[in-house]
Amino acid sequence: VAYELKGQNEYGFKIIGSYDPQLTLVIDPALSTLSAATYLGGTGNDRGFCLALDNSGHVYVAGYTLSSTADFPTTDGAYDRTYHGGYDLFVSRFSSDLKTLEASTYFGGAGTDYLYSMALDSAGYVYLAGATSSNDFPIISGAFQAVYQGGEYDGFVAKLSGDLSTLLASTFLGGSGTDQPASLILDSSFN
C-alpha cells in the first residue's frame, strides 16, 4: 500500500501490489518509533484476533489458542485458568505500556472455539462473539439459547467483567446449520 493525498485534508491509500485481504493492515505514518511491544502465548498455536483499548488505556487482546494450562499465561482471579481442549479462547488485559499482564483468562469448552469479534463499552465490560463446537461451552443460566443447536458450529455472544474475573452473560446463537457470527457492534445503549 502507498499513502496518497486525495485532496485538502483528505488522505487515503492505494494498493500497489498483491495482498491478502484477510490479514489486518497496520500503517504507522512515522514508521520510526516502536512505542511498545510484547509477546503473549504458550507453546501451542496462539492467534490474537482482536485488539481494543478501554477508557483508561488498558490494552485488551483476544483470540484462540492450542496452548495448554501449563504454559499459556493466565492470572490469579481469572474467570477460567484451565485449557479445555481444541482451540480455546483467551482474553488478556495489559497495562497501556504493555509491560504488565494485568488479567488473562481462557474461555471455552472441550470442542473448538473461535473468537471473531470483541468490543468494550464505556463501563469497561468486554463483549465477545464467535463460534464454537463445544456442547459444554460456558453459558449462563437463563440464556437466550442455552443449548447447542447442532451443525459444525454454533455462534455465541458473551460478556465478561473488565478485570476478566466474571462471566456476566453468555448465550449460544444459532440453528441446526453452521453459524459463525463475524462481528459484534454495540449500540449507544451498549446492546
Language-model features: locations:
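Beta-rich catalytic cores
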Residues: 45-47, 87, 112-114, 153, ...
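Acidic/polar, solvent-exposed loop segments in beta-strand-rich repeat domains
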Residues: 63-90, 130-156
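Short loop/turn motifs that cap or connect beta-strands within the blades
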Residues: 31-46, 100-112, 166-177
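A generic structural signal for beta-strand entry/edge sites
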Residues: 8-12, 58, 88, 125, ...
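Charged substrate-recognition surface patches at the periphery of nucleic-acid/ligand-binding domains
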Residues: 1-52, 58
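Hydrophobic strand positions within the blades of repeat-based beta-sheet folds
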Residues: 36-37, 51, 61-63, 77, ...
